């Protein structure tokens, strides 16, 4: 058997290809960013063709960096930014429109009307999700209704939908020449279109959005030896390599953090934050603003479910300090600047740029800086930004404990923001529990590799994967209970100030 597993990690801001050995160690990687297209306020798009070109480049360059060829790979996995919606012509591979990104809020009227009509309760019961701009169903509906010719093309079988996992998979396996149009249960569970109990597209839900069933990819387990086909030799690997694992990014990170037992949780800090709690084979329906989702499904085994708290803006708030406010030149400088003050100076920053996700689900919210005094400066804003990342995670942890009665003993963390040591210390202080960062920080790509390797026998069992995990650093809480309570009370007041800011239109 070949000695390595590859993983495509198609993210919100970049695409990377990583190669791992039997010990789960990184052997080689390459990463490229892609353009963030912002045509209007609240609209966020990506160019699907650019994403596919970046995927080609990173796969070729990672192999070159490692001195490897495609034949050295036993299999590859794919992980991706979830919910981001691509609709393309399967005859040509040409997208009908840019990919509408998960952060995009143009479908707020669609979501509001679903709620007003009472259909929101059906979506929650069947799909485990609230009607929100976040998910794919409304984005597909928007394209069908607003892009000329797409509705007619869909009815004729000439327009298909996929999240970026399906888009990359279809292209890797041949594109117009027999490419496989498929997805996995984790990505499908983020569309508002899949029934969590049947793991199939639900005709009633499809009817809510007016989506023809023929547009949709086949739903497969997250790890399977045959369901996703093989790469074409004409494609970037120049070899026929089995594609045996596909998971949405947060599900992949859950696998990469080896959260295989009920009650185990991880928090990924990236563009947004995503806290996922494994609930086992039990489907737990949230009563406190969380999402019920599929954590993963390996082969023919029953699906494992999870509760998730999705936060739209965390790491991207630091990017805002850099790109819009220009008070730092690099994201890493946020830590240095924030360390020059002892606290937030009474100032709170709620980065509700596109509304608030879990546990509030308020598309009418917008960002706010409150408690501002003449005393405050850029350092206080940097500190308040890091605290906002951590307070939003506390909101989710509180909801998770209410839904599951599970009290976290430690929070496992991963993602780019975890390189910010001050932010992780603040997180431990705000939660009052230790925060643990693993040695291998690229848990999203690693999880996709694990899913692919389990399907091929590269790794035998999840217990073997547990032996790969080790802690790099742990942060212990340092705040007093009084400071923790006062700080959180101030945060909750600040959140209240952001609500009812935007009138959600009726379609």
Curated annotation (Swiss-Prot):
<feature type="binding site">
    <location>
        <position position="271"/>
    </location>
    <ligand>
        <name>ADP</name>
    </ligand>
</feature>
<feature type="binding site">
    <location>
        <position position="416"/>
    </location>
    <ligand>
        <name>ADP</name>
    </ligand>
</feature>
<feature type="binding site">
    <location>
        <position position="249"/>
    </location>
    <ligand>
        <name>sn-glycerol 3-phosphate</name>
    </ligand>
</feature>
<dbReference type="GO" id="GO:0019563">
    <property type="term" value="P:glycerol catabolic process"/>
</dbReference>
<feature type="binding site">
    <location>
        <position position="16"/>
    </location>
    <ligand>
        <name>ADP</name>
    </ligand>
</feature>
<feature type="binding site">
    <location>
        <position position="12"/>
    </location>
    <ligand>
        <name>ADP</name>
    </ligand>
</feature>
<feature type="binding site">
    <location>
        <position position="315"/>
    </location>
    <ligand>
        <name>ADP</name>
    </ligand>
</feature>
<feature type="binding site">
    <location>
        <position position="82"/>
    </location>
    <ligand>
        <name>sn-glycerol 3-phosphate</name>
    </ligand>
</feature>
<feature type="binding site">
    <location>
        <position position="416"/>
    </location>
    <ligand>
        <name>ATP</name>
    </ligand>
</feature>
<feature type="binding site">
    <location>
        <position position="315"/>
    </location>
    <ligand>
        <name>ATP</name>
    </ligand>
</feature>
<feature type="binding site">
    <location>
        <position position="250"/>
    </location>
    <ligand>
        <name>glycerol</name>
    </ligand>
</feature>
<dbReference type="InterPro" id="IPR005999">
    <property type="entry name" value="Glycerol_kin"/>
</dbReference>
<feature type="binding site">
    <location>
        <position position="420"/>
    </location>
    <ligand>
        <name>ADP</name>
    </ligand>
</feature>
<dbReference type="Pfam" id="PF02782">
    <property type="entry name" value="FGGY_C"/>
</dbReference>
<protein>
    <recommendedName>
        <fullName>Glycerol kinase 1</fullName>
        <ecNumber>2.7.1.30</ecNumber>
    </recommendedName>
</protein>
<dbReference type="InterPro" id="IPR018483">
    <property type="entry name" value="Carb_kinase_FGGY_CS"/>
</dbReference>
<feature type="binding site">
    <location>
        <position position="319"/>
    </location>
    <ligand>
        <name>ATP</name>
    </ligand>
</feature>
<feature type="binding site">
    <location>
        <position position="249"/>
    </location>
    <ligand>
        <name>glycerol</name>
    </ligand>
</feature>
<feature type="binding site">
    <location>
        <position position="82"/>
    </location>
    <ligand>
        <name>glycerol</name>
    </ligand>
</feature>
<dbReference type="GO" id="GO:0006072">
    <property type="term" value="P:glycerol-3-phosphate metabolic process"/>
</dbReference>
<keyword id="KW-0319">Glycerol metabolism</keyword>
<keyword id="KW-0418">Kinase</keyword>
<keyword id="KW-0547">Nucleotide-binding</keyword>
<keyword id="KW-0808">Transferase</keyword>
<feature type="binding site">
    <location>
        <position position="83"/>
    </location>
    <ligand>
        <name>glycerol</name>
    </ligand>
</feature>
<comment type="pathway">
    <text>Polyol metabolism; glycerol degradation via glycerol kinase pathway; sn-glycerol 3-phosphate from glycerol: step 1/1.</text>
</comment>
<dbReference type="InterPro" id="IPR018484">
    <property type="entry name" value="FGGY_N"/>
</dbReference>
<dbReference type="GO" id="GO:0004370">
    <property type="term" value="F:glycerol kinase activity"/>
</dbReference>
<feature type="binding site">
    <location>
        <position position="83"/>
    </location>
    <ligand>
        <name>sn-glycerol 3-phosphate</name>
    </ligand>
</feature>
<comment type="similarity">
    <text>Belongs to the FGGY kinase family.</text>
</comment>
<comment type="function">
    <text>Key enzyme in the regulation of glycerol uptake and metabolism. Catalyzes the phosphorylation of glycerol to yield sn-glycerol 3-phosphate.</text>
</comment>
<feature type="binding site">
    <location>
        <position position="134"/>
    </location>
    <ligand>
        <name>sn-glycerol 3-phosphate</name>
    </ligand>
</feature>
<dbReference type="Pfam" id="PF00370">
    <property type="entry name" value="FGGY_N"/>
</dbReference>
<feature type="binding site">
    <location>
        <position position="14"/>
    </location>
    <ligand>
        <name>ATP</name>
    </ligand>
</feature>
<dbReference type="InterPro" id="IPR018485">
    <property type="entry name" value="FGGY_C"/>
</dbReference>
<feature type="binding site">
    <location>
        <position position="134"/>
    </location>
    <ligand>
        <name>glycerol</name>
    </ligand>
</feature>
<dbReference type="InterPro" id="IPR043129">
    <property type="entry name" value="ATPase_NBD"/>
</dbReference>
<dbReference type="GO" id="GO:0005829">
    <property type="term" value="C:cytosol"/>
</dbReference>
<feature type="binding site">
    <location>
        <position position="13"/>
    </location>
    <ligand>
        <name>ATP</name>
    </ligand>
</feature>
<feature type="binding site">
    <location>
        <position position="12"/>
    </location>
    <ligand>
        <name>sn-glycerol 3-phosphate</name>
    </ligand>
</feature>
<keyword id="KW-0067">ATP-binding</keyword>
<dbReference type="GO" id="GO:0006071">
    <property type="term" value="P:glycerol metabolic process"/>
</dbReference>
